């Protein structure tokens, strides 16, 4: 027979284990607790880790089910180049200034030739002299990732103000400092020094045909990793927090949050998260720096459960199609875990 003290200790240990299991909700970088469906959530984490471990480069994943508070965080505090994902921060500060009365969504900005940016979106292909509203520019910035619209808005708001607002929200690693034109000048100037001070309309007409794809990609990679310039910086966890505020109606205000989400639902770049999803509502924003970086972030509603998902990549070695597919598979695994439908070509 066991000693009574040993039996009491065993019972106490069992009670503490039961309490710990019931209270723990998250699976973070070093926290392997769970909610009620521990084994299932751990299984999803292992599937995501498998994609990440076989990814030829760096990958960070942050996922949170806002209905259950279940959370998975893989390398989620590491700062990455966001590329156009930072446009969500610009959108947030834009709505912050709108609601403070500094500007109106109906205000107009007249485009000039100098505002043109390397092909992204649609404005570069249209004649200067248009006068889109600020809401029009916001929409173009999000759904077509238009860099001309982005610089027009960021110049209007002030990039320091965008960063300051992110910091005020508690997102200390989220920042924007340089314009798209700064970035393009640095990249193109690596290929041809005359473009280091080029005007916008000159960058649009850069003679890429004079250079091999390898030369262009080498210059692009140099600009990302060695030139001391960035389009945007953040972590997957911080962008996840920004999206969570948006989903709960607490980013600036309920009206502002809903407006940004409604625009994100009209996203035109759908080669990542939506790739394998079927009949699923999604609001998302991509960030493009192929073949080295392809990011996607957003909110996916699965059976009325809003799920925040953020995937950042970096230093990818391989083709763009494979890069996009790895990001798409992350979203597919998350959606399948929560009972959502996938397309028949997902394996």
Predicted features and spans:
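Bacterial N-terminal signal peptides that target proteins for export
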Residues: 1-11
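Bacterial N-terminal signal peptides
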Residues: 10-20
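Active-site-proximal helix/loop microenvironment
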Residues: 81, 175-252
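Alpha-helix boundary/capping residues
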Residues: 14, 144, 169, 246, ...
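A short small-residue
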Residues: 70, 125-127, 221-224, 312-313
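Active-site-adjacent loops and short helices of periplasmic peptidoglycan-processing enzymes
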Residues: 27-191
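Structured C-terminal helix/loop/strand segments within mature extracytoplasmic catalytic/sensor domains
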Residues: 22-47, 51, 224, 228-347
